[in-house]
A protein has these predicted regions:
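Extracellular/periplasmic metallocenter environments
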Residues: 9-27, 87-129
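N-terminal edge beta-strand
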Residues: 24-55
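Short structured motifs
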Residues: 41-45, 79-82, 91-94
Length: 129
């Protein structure tokens, strides 16, 4: 029984102790965005890209399936660009899109955590020339 309790505690606390794997890098003509989402929001608030640049987003959900709000899933969506990436609990999911025109776009998670109304569950993609 004690072993079961220890395993459950480790499983639930694992995201707290895992190293952060977020950041934005450039790989040739591809902007690589590794972004993490948890109940307290995204860990990146602003992304910059150039017109015509390919953007690869890897979204990691740090929450487990026991969260009552959204079941631990998180989303990275940009309506104007047709982007909708959903990461399952404690998982990573990726998607790629091309920044086709200049402007400032809002990315958000509308699955949990108050959705678009929560300022920590949104950010900006700025596409420049």
């Amino acid at each position: 029984m004690v072993v079961v309790v220890i395993v459950v505690v480790i499983y639930l606390l694992r995201p707290v102790f895992e190293p952060k794997a977020s950041g934005i890098t450039q790989l040739g003509n591809v902007k690589v965005v590794n972004i993490q989402a948890a109940m307290d929001g995204f860990d990146i608030a602003e992304i910059r890209a150039k017109v015509g640049e390919t953007v690869k987003v890897s979204l990691r959900s740090l929450d487990n399936e026991h969260h009552t709000d959204g079941g631990g899933k998180h989303q990275f969506a940009i309506d104007e660009l047709g982007v909708n990436i959903i990461a399952n609990p404690l998982s990573v999911n990726s998607g790629t899109f091309t920044a086709t025109k200049t402007g400032t776009y809002t990315f958000y998670c509308d699955i949990c955590c108050g959705g678009r109304a929560n300022p920590t569950m949104s950010g900006r993609l700025i596409v420049e020339t």
